[in-house]
A protein has these predicted regions:
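N-terminal Rossmann-like NAD(P) cofactor-binding subdomain of oxidoreductases
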Residues: 1-119, 126, 218-221
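Short, solvent-exposed amphipathic alpha-helical segments in soluble enzyme
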Residues: 2-4, 82, 182-186, 243-244
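Generic recognition of short, well-ordered alpha-helical segments
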Residues: 21, 78, 178, 240-241
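Loop/helix-junction capping segments adjacent to catalytic residues or to phosphate/diphosphate-binding pockets
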Residues: 73-77, 173, 236-237
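C-terminal substrate-binding/catalytic lobe of Rossmann-fold NAD(P)-dependent oxidoreductases
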Residues: 94-99, 103-228
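An anion-binding loop in the catalytic cleft
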Residues: 221-224, 228-244
Length: 244
């Protein structure tokens, strides 16, 4: 399709990672190594420059290629990016992300883990230290080798919540109210992202069935920023994001 000049918005993981060795480490040999570098990451709120370049190529009669960000990377990156890009996060310390997703995030194939009698009334971590979305989040946020990511499966049909713990940079001492203002300024031009008031946290029920995302942020007394992001993994983070 690309060779024929067709612009492609890909919802799989084939074009999310730009570095072939990293792709092969976490997945397998890339299906199209030569296309990885030119693919724009499909997360409009955070990768506008890449998407604008793809749009320019398309306007010039060339094919554009977009690799839509995955579900966990979407919620996690939306939650963490404003603080990181503002320089408030220690650039040498690990960042911890714990995320919870509903069972439809695993796809429609029947498995023991997603079978009703196994998933109902059950919460469990999986892919600990090995989940393939780890390098994608690191790439978007510039956290190479510093992300501790642990996904969890919850008995929800739809909805994903990511909690990101970010160590404050030396000398940084924002208040929660200042962070809320920072986040709202950051997403002022992003109508699908809402930032909650100080003391209020995102809820999966508020975004399920939509392409919207909610973010929350607070300062922890231990010198941390705790940022949370909620989305519907079938909307923002999948098909809906492709449309966006």
């Amino acid at each position: 399709l690309i060779a024929a000049g067709v612009t492609v918005v890909d919802l799989s993981a084939d074009f999310r990672l730009k570095d072939p060795p990293i792709y092969e480490k976490w997945y397998a040999p890339p299906p199209a190594t030569d296309l990885l570098a030119q693919a724009a990451v499909g997360l409009p709120e955070l990768t506008g420059d890449e998407l604008a370049a793809a749009a320019e190529r398309r306007a010039a009669g060339e094919a554009g290629l977009v690799g839509c960000a995955g579900c966990y990377p979407t919620a996690t990156s939306l939650a963490a990016a404003p603080a990181i890009r503002a320089g408030l996060v220690d650039a040498a310390a690990p960042v911890v992300a714990d995320a919870v997703s509903g069972v439809t995030g695993a796809g429609k194939k029947a498995t023991e883990r997603t079978h009703y009698c196994c998933a109902n009334e059950n919460l469990e971590a999986y892919g600990v230290g090995t989940h393939r979305h780890t390098p994608e989040i690191e790439q978007i946020l510039g956290l190479e080798g510093r992300l501790v990511f642990t996904p969890h499966l919850a008995p929800l049909n739809r909805g994903l919540l990511s909690t990101v713990t970010l160590p404050l940079a030396p000398g940084a001492a924002p208040t929660t109210e200042e962070l809320v203002e920072l986040y709202r300024d950051f997403y002022a031009a992003s109508p699908l992202v809402s930032v909650m008031d100080a003391g209020v946290q995102p809820r999966t029920a508020s975004v399920a069935g939509t392409c919207r995302a909610q973010g929350g942020v607070a300062v922890h007394p231990a010198g941390m920023i705790v940022a949370t992001g909620a989305s519907d993994h079938l909307g923002q983070g999948a098909a809906g994001q492709g449309v966006e």
